[in-house]
């Protein structure tokens, strides 16, 4: 071998010779198909490891019809919520012998379409996706993937327009419970940050279902939970207490500031995401108000900072890793041929009561 020349990669034949078996036996062992005894499998794997043999995944996929890869599409891979989901997917997939490819979309439907096409081009066996589509919006890119034989499992979102599995949390139930706890603590004016993004906010509670139909499933479910709590306690719906702006921390600060400037301002805020919490707290600070002495706050998603804040933040804790694990298990069931009807798997969230809510 000339100086600087890379050594030749070990071959299937060399693995077979070292293990004392035929090439076909090595191919079956490393390819994960056919019947191989435990003793033979151990010899083949030991020889492959000793030689540093790396299997040709393309050749394997041509033999088995699978790449043993799951594609995952989420809005923001840096968001702690989606990072938790990704962790759950990865752990479950790895335990079942699957690799994971992840693409972020920034909650952009055009980017989502491109992401799905990219994953299909890479021959993934199935896709787990937190879709950016509204709950009643057509999703031809996902329907096309299903027609092409690629299982789809929705995570954190559900859609009325496609017949496939969805793994979600109990957004509506836990929001009603949380807002009801505020009401039972004496609060009658409760701000809601955020509602679904829309240029035509609800003027009364009867408009809410129309807004929800076009919204992300999770956003819509939380708004429905909020209105459920108001109805349950015979409180009026006030559109001025619901933010429908872009979902950024700055917009949350602006929206809550507007609520605090009302003649009858809220005494509590229910914030549906981490940026909504920090934006709400910033609005209070700008006006010299304190949580919970002046305004109580409940947030969504637990984190280390929520517990060490002063006061510690009362939050809805979503089981992010459980969401991801359940979604991965569901798509693997589909990949491996389990034939059943589409189902919604609902994972329970928990209201963690800390120090950011005061009695009125």
Regions found by a protein language model. Give the residues of each.
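N-terminal helix-turn-helix DNA-binding module of bacterial transcription factors
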Residues: 1-68, 358-360
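Alpha-helical recognition/docking segments in bacterial nutrient-uptake
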Residues: 1-13, 65, 69-184
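Short beta-strand segments enriched in small/hydrophobic residues
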Residues: 18, 23-28, 63-76, 189-196, ...
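Short gly/ser/thr-rich secondary-structure transition/capping motifs
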Residues: 50-56, 110, 136, 281
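Structural motif
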Residues: 54, 100-121, 241-262
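Generic recognition of short, well-ordered alpha-helical segments
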Residues: 57, 83-85, 114, 140, ...
């Amino acid at each position: 071998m000339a100086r600087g020349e890379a050594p030749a990669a070990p071959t299937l034949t060399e693995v077979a010779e070292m293990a004392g078996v035929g090439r076909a036996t090595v191919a079956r062992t490393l390819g994960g198909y056919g019947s191989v005894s435990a003793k033979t499998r151990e010899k083949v794997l030991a020889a492959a490891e000793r030689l540093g043999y790396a299997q040709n995944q393309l050749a394997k996929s041509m033999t088995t019809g699978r790449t043993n890869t799951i594609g995952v599409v989420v809005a923001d891979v840096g968001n702690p919520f989606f990072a938790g989901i990704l962790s759950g997917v990865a752990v479950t997939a790895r335990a079942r012998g699957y690799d994971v490819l992840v693409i972020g979309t920034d909650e952009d439907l055009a980017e989502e379409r491109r992401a799905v096409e990219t994953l299909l081009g890479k021959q993934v066996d199935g896709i787990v996706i937190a879709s950016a589509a509204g709950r009643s919006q057509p999703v031809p890119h996902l329907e096309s993937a299903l027609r092409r034989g690629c299982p789809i499992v929705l995570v954190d979102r559900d859609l009325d327009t496609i017949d496939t599995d969805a793994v979600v949390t109990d957004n509506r139930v836990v929001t009603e419970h949380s807002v009801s706890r505020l009401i039972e603590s004496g609060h009658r004016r409760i701000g809601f940050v955020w509602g679904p993004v829309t240029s035509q906010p609800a003027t009364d509670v009867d408009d809410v279902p129309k807004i929800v139909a076009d919204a992300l499933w999770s956003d819509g479910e939380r708004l429905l939970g909020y209105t459920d709590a108001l109805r349950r306690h015979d409180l009026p719906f006030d559109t001025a207490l619901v933010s429908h702006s872009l979902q950024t921390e700055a917009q949350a600060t602006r929206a809550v500031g507007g609520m605090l400037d009302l003649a009858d301002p809220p005494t509590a805020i229910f914030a549906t995401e981490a940026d909504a919490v920090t934006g709400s707290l910033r609005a209070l600070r700008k006006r010299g108000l304190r949580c919970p002495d002046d305004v109580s706050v409940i947030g969504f998603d637990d984190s280390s900072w929520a517990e060490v804040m002063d006061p510690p933040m009362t939050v809805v804790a979503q089981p992010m890793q459980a969401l991801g694990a359940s979604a991965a298990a569901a798509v693997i069931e589909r990949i491996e041929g389990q034939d059943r009807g589409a189902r919604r798997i609902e994972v329970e969230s928990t209201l963690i009561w800390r120090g950011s809510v005061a009695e009125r």
